[in-house]
């Protein structure tokens, strides 16, 4: 209460910041006359002078900001016939300061970005503009390139599916690069799997503007980017677990209010935390069905894991809500955008469990080769900024995790949209009927309606109901997302009815004409509250752009997921007190507040989850940075591994001595020299004469073995020149490093999966994870030292004579195989084994095998 009064008297921090920016806007406006009087060539010349001054460090970016913004505004007027409003200049300054600009729908965020983009591209270190999809990346780059090209700046676009390294390199070397968050992240991971510096496509991470920043840095923060490879593990367990899961019966959790109450059934589902707990009865039943004595024995660990995932697949994941089945494949539906996430798969065997559930071909389990979260990728940039229409609800998270401040930019024209209170019905069916009646009422007078649904399944239900009512409409969901921009752009036409899942065409404007304005503008109907208030605000924000009229309202029921899981007891009590009959609804601020409190509960759960993921990923991130930094050193053409190999060889020999129980301080006569010679030969291919090293003390023995390995190695390397030696050492070392890092990531995945159980032992799982992961990393370092020396010692070079011999042997083998083919006489109608493509009877079968042809 006191805080609210203080804000009214003194103004908020946001208000103070906006006032500061408005003072600078006046200075930029004062320059408008100066630049509008210049010819095109004079304007370009002025910009070039500023760029030269900046590159020669005579001025800073802040010194020239006013002039650059004024020039960009003038160029935009001349090329695009669009003039930046004052509030757009403020948005540009907020982005330039490394903050988040919250700008409502239709305020021209794409044009705002051109201001800081041009200013930060002037130092030639590159600027990245990140969008949520390929369509927006291509559209924004194409539209705004007229401004950039006028000023002599180059523009590149990174699109998914176009993996030509040379083209990508050109795009990244442009002054300005547009692309999606996934492509930027994956290119970073791919670059750190390359074997030459010249093969890398990205350059330094300088300045980035993230469009729809809330979607990318918050909604997708729980989804790491993973490059994976096959594990070659058997897939039978998934089918077996699926059969067992179908026979287990779902029960109810124990009631904490009733003493000694127990969970019923074979397993209990906790929808709030999206987890499943198998009861004692369920464990006994599963053991019987699997035919094992103890499901939780070490040898059955994979079985119990498969069963957990199968139960999740059947009880927590719904077809057409969380995933769709298309072309015999299970494809994830992004819960925030409603789009299909093709190419993305659930990890830890969950995707395979869904494939078993749906009876489609189970694809091989994958192993992580490289991974990173968006949180850690975007924190690599020297300066990170973002823009969106909805960020204030997550301002705390932006501040805590990304050190980003959210500044709300005033609208150019006041918002005229009317947001009505929610209507709540007892059942989902009543709600559906009420929505259809409301659509009919609006449709009769011609007011366009956009209906937002939470899933593909619900959008299909509305589609069928509207078909029954003979109301013409368009459907936009993940199944027909190809026409997204086209469908959304038409949603503001008179009489239009559009059903859309959460995707609702972000970045595409819904324009309305004067006739629709007279009818009250676009009517937004939300059919379910999302877990995040921000997603609801985005749906509302589709109407009322640039001062247009509009209307929005949410229709809810007590059977909606959010209210059922998180908040319906209080609301149900209110409805019972008011004696609400079937088909009736309630509309009150009290209920709307209760719904918002339920959403806040979920948001804080998700925030904790993202924070938790980041805390764990920060541990892995430090290790990732260390490995990638070392990898970059290896790729440096001037880096010589000679000293590193000498040092690693010493550690390698110490490891071999430890293996055969030869320790410092032991008596030379008691050392098992025969075993040592055997191990050295097995691990390095180097033969040592026992008599040469018998009776030596520990240090003399170690030196002798090291010298022998070094002599062998130098002798082998003497057949090639120094440059070739360096290249071979680097390539082999990189291969060993990548293999060791892959194995390390696999071990880290296993560690992360089970670490939560340490909490039952009164230990902090995060502290335990840090300790264990440090130990794993030290194992990685030791493995790298030993494996690299082992590989370098064992490798052998072929002379030209060896190559010729191999080729001759190969040829003889092929001829022998062919002879064998002919000895097993084929049937007359079978294809002829000579490879002609004809039947045997029409070819070699005519007059016996024509051996002369193959001599």
UniProtKB/Swiss-Prot annotation:
GO terms for molecular function: ATP binding; metal ion binding; protein-exporting ATPase activity. May bind 1 zinc ion per subunit. Residues 815-837 are annotated as: Disordered. Keywords: ATP-binding, Cell inner membrane, Cell membrane, Cytoplasm, Membrane, Metal-binding, Nucleotide-binding, Protein transport, Translocase, Translocation, Transport, Zinc. It comes from the Bacteria. It is an enzyme of class 7 (translocase). The keyword Cell membrane applies. CDD domains: DEXDc_SecA, SF2_C_secA. ATP binds at residues 88, 106-110, 509. Its EC number is 7.4.2.8. It is a peripheral membrane protein. Zn(2+) binds at residues 832, 834, 843-844. It is found in: Cell inner membrane; Cytoplasm. Its main location: membrane. Its cofactor is Zn(2+). One of its GO terms (cellular component) is cell envelope Sec protein transport complex. Gene3D superfamilies: Helical scaffold and wing domains of SecA (1.10.3060.10), P-loop containing nucleotide triphosphate hydrolases (3.40.50.300), SecA, preprotein cross-linking domain (3.90.1440.10). One of its GO terms (biological process) is protein targeting. The keyword Chloroplast does not apply. It catalyses: ATP + H2O + cellular proteinSide 1 = ADP + phosphate + cellular proteinSide 2. InterPro entries: Helicase_ATP-bd, Helicase_C-like, P-loop_NTPase, SEC_C_motif, SecA, SecA_DEAD, SecA_motor_DEAD, SecA_preprotein_X-link_dom. Part of the Sec protein translocase complex. Interacts with the SecYEG preprotein conducting channel. Has a central role in coupling the hydrolysis of ATP to the transfer of proteins into and across the cell membrane, serving as an ATP-driven molecular motor driving the stepwise translocation of polypeptide chains across the membrane. Belongs to the SecA family. Monomer and homodimer. Part of the essential Sec protein translocation apparatus which comprises SecA, SecYEG and auxiliary proteins SecDF-YajC and YidC. This is Protein translocase subunit SecA. It comes from Campylobacter fetus subsp. fetus (strain 82-40).
């Amino acid at each position: 209460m006191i805080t609210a009064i203080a804000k009214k008297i003194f103004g908020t921090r946001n208000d103070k910041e906006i006032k500061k920016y408005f003072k600078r806007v006046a200075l930029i406006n004062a320059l408008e006359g100066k630049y509008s009087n210049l010819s095109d060539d004079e304007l370009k010349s002025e910009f070039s002078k500023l760029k030269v001054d900046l590159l020669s460090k005579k001025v800073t970016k802040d010194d020239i900001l006013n002039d650059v913004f004024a020039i960009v505004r003038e160029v935009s007027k001349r090329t695009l016939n669009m003039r930046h409003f004052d509030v757009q200049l403020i948005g540009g300054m907020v982005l330039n300061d490394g903050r988040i600009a919250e700008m409502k729908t239709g305020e021209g965020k794409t044009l705002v970005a051109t201001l800081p983009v041009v200013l930060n591209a002037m130092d030639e270190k590159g600027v990245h503009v990140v969008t949520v999809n390929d369509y927006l990346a291509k559209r924004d780059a194409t539209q705004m390139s007229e401004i950039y090209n006028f000023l002599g700046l180059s523009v590149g676009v990174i699109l998914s599916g176009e993996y030509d390294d040379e083209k990508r390199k050109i795009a990244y070397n442009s002054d300005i690069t547009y692309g999606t968050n996934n492509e930027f992240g994956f290119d970073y991971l791919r670059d750190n799997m390359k074997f030459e510096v010249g093969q890398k496509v990205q350059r330094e991470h300088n300045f980035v503007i993230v469009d729809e920043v809330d979607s990318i840095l918050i909604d997708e923060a729980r989804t790491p980017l993973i490059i994976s490879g096959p594990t070659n593990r058997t897939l039978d367990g998934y089918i077996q677990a699926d059969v067992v899961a179908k026979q287990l019966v779902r029960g109810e959790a124990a009631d904490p209010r009733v003493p000694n109450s127990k969970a019923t059934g074979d397993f209990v589902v906790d929808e709030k935390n999206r987890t499943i707990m198998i009861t004692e009865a369920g464990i006994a039943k599963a053991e019987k069905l699997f035919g094992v004595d103890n499901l939780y024995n070490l040898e059955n660990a994979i079985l119990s894991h498969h069963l957990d995932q199968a139960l999740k697949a059947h009880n927590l994941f719904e077809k057409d809500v969380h995933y769709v089945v298309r072309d015999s494949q299970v494809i994830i539906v992004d819960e925030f955008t409603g789009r299909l996430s093709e190419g993305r798969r659930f990890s830890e065997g969950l995707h395979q469990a869904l494939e078993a559930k749906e009876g489609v071909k189970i694809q091989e389990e994958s192993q992580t080769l490289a991974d990173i979260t968006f949180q850690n990728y975007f924190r690599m940039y020297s300066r990170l900024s973002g823009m969106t229409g909805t960020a204030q609800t997550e301002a705390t998270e932006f501040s805590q995790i990304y050190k980003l401040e959210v500044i709300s930019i005033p609208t150019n024209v006041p918002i005229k949209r009317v947001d009505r209170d929610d209507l709540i019905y007892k059942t989902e069916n009543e709600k559906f009927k009420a929505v259809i009646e409301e659509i009919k009422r609006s449709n009769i007078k011609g007011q366009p309606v956009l209906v937002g649904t939470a899933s593909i399944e619900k959008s299909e239900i509305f589609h069928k109901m509207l078909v029954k009512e003979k109301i013409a409409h368009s459907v936009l969901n993940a199944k027909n997302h190809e026409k997204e921009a086209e469908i959304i752009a038409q949603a503001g036409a008179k009489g239009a009815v559009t059903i859309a899942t959460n995707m609702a065409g972000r970045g595409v404007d819904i324009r309305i004409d004067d006739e629709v304005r007279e009818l009250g503008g676009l009517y937004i109907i939300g059919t379910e509250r999302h877990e995040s208030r921000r997603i609801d605000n985005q749906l509302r924000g589709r109407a009322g752009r640039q001062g247009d009229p509009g209307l929005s309202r949410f229709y809810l029921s007590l059977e909606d997921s959010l209210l059922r899981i998180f908040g319906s007891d209080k609301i149900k009590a209110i409805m019972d007190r008011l004696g609400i009959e079937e088909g009736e609804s309630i509309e009150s601020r009290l209920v709307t507040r209760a719904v918002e409190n339920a959403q806040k509960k979920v948001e804080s759960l998700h925030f904790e989850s993202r924070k938790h993921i980041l805390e764990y990923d920060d541990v892995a991130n430090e290790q990732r940075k260390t490995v990638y930094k070392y990898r970059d050193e290896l790729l440096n053409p001037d880096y010589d591994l000679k000293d590193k190999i000498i040092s690693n060889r010493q550690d390698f020999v110490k490891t071999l001595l430890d293996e055969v129980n030869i320790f410092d301080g032991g008596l030379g006569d008691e050392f098992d020299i025969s075993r040592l010679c055997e191990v050295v030969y097995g691990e390095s291919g180097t033969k040592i004469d026992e008599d040469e090293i018998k009776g030596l003390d520990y240090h003399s023995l170690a030196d002798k073995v090291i010298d022998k390995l070094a002599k062998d190695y130098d002798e082998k390397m003497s057949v090639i020149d120094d440059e070739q030696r360096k290249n071979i050492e680097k390539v082999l070392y990189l291969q060993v490093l990548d293999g060791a890092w892959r194995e390390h990531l696999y071990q880290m995945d296993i560690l992360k999966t089970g670490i939560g159980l340490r909490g039952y032992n009164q230990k902090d799982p995060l502290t335990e994870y840090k300790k264990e992961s440090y130990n794993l990393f030290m194992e990685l370092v030791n493995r790298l030292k030993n494996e690299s020396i082992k590989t370098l010692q064992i490798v052998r070079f072929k002379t030209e004579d060896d190559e010729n011999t191999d080729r001759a042997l190969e040829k003889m083998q092929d001829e022998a195989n062919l002879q064998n083919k002919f000895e097993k006489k084929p049937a007359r109608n079978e294809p002829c084994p000579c490879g002609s493509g004809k039947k045997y009877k029409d070819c070699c079968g005519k007059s016996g095998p024509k051996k002369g042809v193959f001599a």
